[in-house]
Amino acid sequence: GRGGALGALLLSPRSGALPSTHSLLQEAQGLPHGTACTAARQGGGRGRGGNAWESPEGCLMFSVLLRTPMGGERVPFLQYAASLAAVQAVQSHCAGDDLGLRIKWPNDLFAEGQKVGGVLCTSAYREGQFEVLVGLGLNFTNSRPTTCVADLLAARRPGCSLPSREALLAGILERLEEHAGTIEACGFTPLRDAYTALWLHTGQEVRFEDGDTLVVEGLADSGFLLARRKGGSETFELHPDGNRLDFWTGLLRRRVPD
């Protein structure tokens, strides 16, 4: 096998601060599968598209290295697995309450209409397998700039104690490991219902400039959105155009043959 469980080797700076957990793992050579890196603060984090992502004190942040022989068509689903793992871990550590945490496709975590976290995955193919770095940031005790797990828990479950950062991190990694194993063996299909039960998009209408309106129905086998023409039966996959900061402002339609 590949050795240790996710997080069996955990790197954490003594000062608490790092430029980026992702960069540290990316630049280090020969780290074993499952190596994770966490920091209390990072100043050079990255979001999707290489955008700078500052992470203040109070965020739960980590990156973890996965080495996997899964096919390239399955690798993109690991970002969905990470989002799902985060919401499930919060639920299991917060008295069974998911705190209204929801997944905004493809890789953001929202609560009360505000972004509270996000996932970044990068991959490289080496020696017959993929090396995938999964990075996740979640507002844990920092009430700014939006809201955080601590505030959501206090509002919804007064008197319920906040889990430790370490316990929540362990819970996320445990579930991510389980989900990655499922994707490797069977693809994302066994996880799809759990994922779409926790996302924001079922029934969401997407309007196009030509007046066409599509209704999101779920996730296609490709990992893109599956939508149906409003009032019709034609099915489409919705793809981001790759040039927009917000996926939802630039979706491209591709008709799915009947």
Stretches found by the model and what they are:
Residues G1-G96, C160, L251-D258:
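N-terminal lobe of the biotin/lipoate ligase/transferase fold
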Residues G7, P69-G100, A111-D258:
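Long, positively charged amphipathic alpha-helical accessory segments at protein N-termini or as interdomain linkers
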